[in-house]
Amino acid sequence: MPDFSRELALGGVVAGVDEVGRGPLAGPVVAAAAILPADLPPEIAALIDDSKRLSPAQREAALAALIESGAAISAAAASVAEIARLNILQASLLAMRRAVARLAVRPDHVLVDGQVAPDLPMPCTPVVGGDGLSLSIAAASIAAKLVRDRAMSRLDRRYPGYGWARNSGYGTKTHRDAILGLGITPHHRRGFGPLLPPA
């Protein structure tokens, strides 16, 4: 379970940052940033974990509790066009920078999930497996996952048949079969695999 030890060791205002959506065949990559109150109640901390370990209902409950606790949370995306122009890593880092810039509170330090840190105007520390280690990063992972899933559900209503409300744009059999049968939409990532040749 993630804890608050890294944040406490750094002192000051610490934001956790994570992204979701690097691997899908369609849709944006979304990042979120979270600054948790130092006195976060233990019953709320117990709700927070790596978003991949939580059900949709658990993620919704955790985010609602975090907002109620006074956590500062923001999210931002990089579009399919930006992914094509920059590459997925650089687009992910762009979304992270945008999420940090949107925070209502400027952090003194940022903890980011993964091996590569975005270029930010404050110190930034990458934490491999951070969404399972840091409460702030885990909170960001929950927010990013919810924001991206909601975006893909909206796109699913505009482009029915690809199953995006269920597969979030990942390359499931249903999604791959739909690409073969229905073709490619403007929200597919060209160059992501043999079904999506470069434009």
UniProtKB/Swiss-Prot annotation:
Top-level taxon in the UniProt lineage: Bacteria
Q: Does the keyword Phosphoprotein apply?
A: no
The free-text note explaining how the cofactor binds reads:
Manganese or magnesium. Binds 1 divalent metal ion per monomer in the absence of substrate. May bind a second metal ion after substrate binding.
The residues covered by the RNase H type-2 domain are 12-199
Q: Which InterPro entries match?
A: RNase_HII (IPR022898), RNase_HII/HIII (IPR001352), RNase_HII/HIII_dom (IPR024567), RNaseH-like_sf (IPR012337), RNaseH_sf (IPR036397)
Q: Where is the signal peptide?
A: none
Q: Which reaction does it catalyse?
A: Endonucleolytic cleavage to 5'-phosphomonoester
GO molecular function terms noted in the UniProt entry: manganese ion binding; RNA binding; RNA-DNA hybrid ribonuclease activity
Q: Where in the cell is it found?
A: Cytoplasm
Record has Lipid biosynthesis as a keyword: no
Q: Which cysteines are joined by disulfide bonds?
A: none
Alphabetical list of Pfam families matching this protein? RNase_HII
- Enzyme Commission number(s) of this protein: 3.1.26.4
Q: Which UniProt keywords apply?
A: Cytoplasm, Endonuclease, Hydrolase, Manganese, Metal-binding, Nuclease
Residues bound to a divalent metal cation: 18-19, 113
Q: Which BP terms from GO are recorded? A: DNA replication, removal of RNA primer; mismatch repair
GO cellular component annotations of the record:
cytoplasm; ribonuclease H2 complex
Q: What class of enzyme is it?
A: hydrolase
Give the cofactors, semicolon-separated: Mn(2+); Mg(2+)
Protein family (similarity comment) = Belongs to the RNase HII family.
Q: What does this protein do?
A: Endonuclease that specifically degrades the RNA of RNA-DNA hybrids.
Q: What is this protein called?
A: Ribonuclease HII
Q: What is the lineage of its organism?
A: Bacteria, Pseudomonadati, Pseudomonadota, Alphaproteobacteria, Acetobacterales
